[in-house]
């Protein structure tokens, strides 16, 4: 399955979650349900709170970067439940993409 096909599935799930639960819940609620739907309904490999290290001159450095969800090692999903996205949120996903080698990332704000 391509990155774009995975992204369409994720957006559809996010829409359904938001339609049923609405805004205002903690991010972890949306994350848990998203993971559940991807695994149970679509039988996809999902890693939750995936650590993303920095590799510098063959030294692995753990800086605390964690992607909310990685699907099939092809798509990073960063979920938010905040008033509005700030530039730092886009930078966060770009950092994760560059460090992980994953090609596509999505930010979804449930608020």
Could you tell me what each predicted segment is?
Residues 23-74, 82:
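Active-site metal-binding core of divalent-cation-utilizing nuclease and nuclease-like domains
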Residues 2, 25, 59-60, 93, ...:
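Nucleic-acid endonuclease domains
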Residues 77:
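Conserved beta3 VAIK motif of the Hanks protein kinase fold
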Residues 17, 37-40, 99:
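Active-site catalytic microenvironments for nucleophilic, acid-base chemistry
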Residues 80-111:
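Nucleic-acid nuclease catalytic cores
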Residues 1-21:
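Interdomain/boundary linker segments immediately adjacent to catalytic/signaling cores
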């Amino acid at each position: 399955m391509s990155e774009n096909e995975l992204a369409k599935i994720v957006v559809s799930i996010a829409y359904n979650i938001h339609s049923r639960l609405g805004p205002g819940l903690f991010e972890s609620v949306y994350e848990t349900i998203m993971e559940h739907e991807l695994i149970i309904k679509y039988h996809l490999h999902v890693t939750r709170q995936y650590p993303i290290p920095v590799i510098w001159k063959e030294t692995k450095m753990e800086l605390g970067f964690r992607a909310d969800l990685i699907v099939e090692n092809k798509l990073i999903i960063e979920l938010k439940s905040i008033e509005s996205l700030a530039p730092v949120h886009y930078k966060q996903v770009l950092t994760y993409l560059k460090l992980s080698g994953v090609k596509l990332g999505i930010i979804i704000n449930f608020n």
